[in-house]
A protein has these predicted regions:
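Catalytic glycan-binding domains that act on GlcNAc-containing polysaccharides
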Residues: 1-183
């Protein structure tokens, strides 16, 4: 079972931010999708880091599929498309602000849609969660609670870790959301 952020752990790989994980009621409050609640810029960031691994995985899945089957053809087509998306994601500088800007384009939004693909999305989100865990381990935090993972995801890994230090526990923090988002689904 994968812990899903922003849903008390009960969300799914296709969970949309703002939609209740059990009743499926509500209105989307952002582009955040899935276990890791990836924003479009996160999807671009993760694809630029791990895209080749995903393409190879799709090709391996195709090789293991029945020869000449629709599934094999579908996976091969998907691998070609994902390779193209990976090249595009890597064509921009590896900077968060550039990923945010690119995420607002049609191509950037198309890349974000890979989260909804059953062969790509769940794994992309798990890789994002694993990255948070690895960052925490490098900082000496071996075990994280769901809330701590959520904080790192929301604030950014480094800032999230800083916010968990004793000095930061009493410091004021930024409100990451627009006020209207709090009232939209009540």
């Amino acid at each position: 079972r994968v812990y899903a952020l922003e849903t008390s752990g009960f969300g799914t790989a296709d969970m949309q931010s703002g939609i209740h994980p059990i009743t499926r009621k509500g209105e989307p409050i952002s582009t955040a999708i899935g276990y890791a609640q990836l924003l479009a810029a996160n999807s671009i960031n993760e694809l630029s880091k791990h895209g080749n691994e995903f393409v190879e995985r799709l090709r391996d899945m195709a090789k293991r599929s029945a020869p000449g089957s629709d599934r094999q053809r579908s996976l091969n087509v998907k691998a070609v498309a994902l390779a193209r998306m990976t090249r595009k994601a890597r064509s921009i500088p590896y900077q968060w602000s550039r990923h945010v800007a690119f995420s607002k384009t049609d191509i950037g939004q198309g890349i974000h849609a890979i989260n909804l693909d059953g062969d790509i999305g769940p794994r992309l989100q798990v890789i994002k969660l694993k990255g948070l865990r690895t960052t925490a381990q490098k900082a000496g935090m071996e075990r994280l609670t769901g809330a701590e993972i959520e904080l790192m995801n929301l604030a950014g890994p480094g800032t999230g870790l800083e916010m968990m230090t004793p000095a930061a526990l009493k410091a004021p923090s930024t409100n990451f959301f627009s006020r209207s988002a709090y009232y939209r689904n009540t």
